[in-house]
């Protein structure tokens, strides 16, 4: 996709099937792709979207710049899934802007399984009685760099948001997370939570995290936090004492670390496929998505 996509779901329309868009980079020379996605979900509508980025010709430099805009009208439900499994020669800059109206529900899930250099930015404006979930999963190795930045603005009362981002970094990979929650003075009875958990699987991997919380109203429930650590040596010792090889024990612990993120996915096909891909990725095997319609 080199241009743009406009998806309009009319009032009251509830789509049962997932809309999937697959971008495959198959260039024989360095390339740049600029794309824009606009999603408008009407009142009391429902839509699920799955965007996938894949590379067919490895080693060809490519740059992707994309902007995604989501408008969720009153009572609408929008699920947006973004899966990136590209080559180390690929760089991607992605910005997502979402605006929710009263009583709407929005889920945004961004997964980076492989890339070169990726930066994802999320900006979400939350109205009254809305529910918002923002989830991110990153697995990076080599000299890959993955940054995620999120800003969730609660502008009205009785809204809920949850942010959860997890990273597994190995070799000399670099990760970054900058997450912000802002609760305005008129946003009483807001509940907003943010969590960033990171696992460094090598001595040279680095993670930079900066959770932020701004509250201008008293009657709220909010929390934020971040933690970065390494594999539990006691758990590794226990597993090895039970005859499990070290590499397999490490892979099992890392898979377990990501399992709750995968559990949040409400697309059964995508959830099963991600379990398969994460297992292959952490096992050092080539990613193979297979048939694209499997995830829907």
Please give the residue ranges for each predicted region:
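Conserved beta-strand/loop scaffold segments within soluble protein domains that form the structured core
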Residues: 1-244, 258, 262-291, 295-296
């Amino acid at each position: 996709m080199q241009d743009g996509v406009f998806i309009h779901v009319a009032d009251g329309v509830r789509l049962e099937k997932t809309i999937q868009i697959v971008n495959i980079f198959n260039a024989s020379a360095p390339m740049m792709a600029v794309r824009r996605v606009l999603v408008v979900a009407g009142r009391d509508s429902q839509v699920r979207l799955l965007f996938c980025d894949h590379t067919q010709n490895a080693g060809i430099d490519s740059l992707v710049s994309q902007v995604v805009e989501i408008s969720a009208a009153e009572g609408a439900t929008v699920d947006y899934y973004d899966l990136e499994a590209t080559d180390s020669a690929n760089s991607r800059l992605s910005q997502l802007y979402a605006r929710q109206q009263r009583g709407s529900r929005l889920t945004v899930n961004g997964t980076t399984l492989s890339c070169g250099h990726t930066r994802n930015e999320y900006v979400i404006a939350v109205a009254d009685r809305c529910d918002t979930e923002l989830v991110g999963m990153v697995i990076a190795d080599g000299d890959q760099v993955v940054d995620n930045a999120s800003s969730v603005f609660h502008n009205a009362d009785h809204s809920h948001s949850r942010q959860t981002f997890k990273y597994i970094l190995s070799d000399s990979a670099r990760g970054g997370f900058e997450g912000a929650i802002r609760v305005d003075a008129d946003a009483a009875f807001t509940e907003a939570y943010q969590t960033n958990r990171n696992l460094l699987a090598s001595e040279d991997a680095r993670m930079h995290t900066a959770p932020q919380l701004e509250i201008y109203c008293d009657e709220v429930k909010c929390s934020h936090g971040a933690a970065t650590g390494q594999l539990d040596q006691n758990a590794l010792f226990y597993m090895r004492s039970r005859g499990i090889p070290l590499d397999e024990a490490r892979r099992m612990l890392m898979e377990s670390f990501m399992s709750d993120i995968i559990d949040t996915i409400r697309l059964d096909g995508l959830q099963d496929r991600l379990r398969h891909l994460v297992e292959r990725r952490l096992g050092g095997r080539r990613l193979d998505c297979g048939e694209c319609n499997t995830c829907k």
